[in-house]
Amino acid sequence: MDRRTKEQVAVELHEKVKSFKLAVLANFSGMGVAKMTTLRNDLRKSNAELKVVKNTLLRIASRDTSLEALQDDFKGPLALILGYGDPVEPSKILSDFAKKNAELELKIGMLSDKVITVEQLSALAELPSREILLAKLLSVMVGVQTQLVNVLSAVPRGLVQVLDGYRAKKEESN
């Protein structure tokens, strides 16, 4: 690559690095093209991407961003995984892929602007997705309203049952 191309790539990468929600550095030594393509496609479905970038370009692109905190880990052949949406989905994909493929070694990550370890990334992967958490919250909120309606309607319902029993008893006596 000539200097202009490198500068352009660094600027584009800098823009992407400024907007990530999840960033993961991984060693991919020995991984074949087919596996790398599969991983890229899976990540793309979850609003994330995998970039193989030279360490010097990554150092330049990460200046004045939160990713600058990981500069000590920019060593060896690196894959940079950037997630732009819900961080749980890409972390699940990476954790599952790393378990099945020993060639992918997750090194360190960053959640927004906090450095996370591989263990914390695995814990993040165990969380339910955002949609599932929202559904659980909604069911709790609806459950409270349903219980409130049941409690409030219990007194009138009881009164109606007492009056109906009184009416039935009166009809029997007549």
From Swiss-Prot:
Function: Forms part of the ribosomal stalk, playing a central role in the interaction of the ribosome with GTP-bound translation factors.
Species of provenance: Syntrophus aciditrophicus (strain SB)
Xref: NCBIfam families: PRK00099.1-1
Pfam families named among the record's database cross-references: Ribosomal_L10 (PF00466)
Gene3D superfamilies hit by this protein: 3.30.70.1730, 6.10.250.290
Cross-referenced InterPro entries: Ribosomal_uL10, Ribosomal_uL10-like_sf, Ribosomal_uL10_bac, Ribosomal_uL10_bac_type
Assembly description: Part of the ribosomal stalk of the 50S ribosomal subunit. The N-terminus interacts with L11 and the large rRNA to form the base of the stalk. The C-terminus forms an elongated spine to which L12 dimers bind in a sequential fashion forming a multimeric L10(L12)X complex.
Keywords assigned: Ribonucleoprotein, Ribosomal protein, RNA-binding, rRNA-binding
rRNA-binding recorded as keyword: yes
Molecular-function GO terms, alphabetical: large ribosomal subunit rRNA binding
Biological processes per GO annotation: translation
Protein name listed in UniProt: Large ribosomal subunit protein uL10
Taxonomic lineage: Bacteria, Pseudomonadati, Thermodesulfobacteriota, Syntrophia, Syntrophales
PANTHER family for the chain: 39S RIBOSOMAL PROTEIN L10, MITOCHONDRIAL
Highest taxon listed in the record's lineage: Bacteria
rRNA-binding as UniProt keyword: yes
Family assignment from sequence similarity: Belongs to the universal ribosomal protein uL10 family.
GO cellular component annotations of the record: ribonucleoprotein complex; ribosome
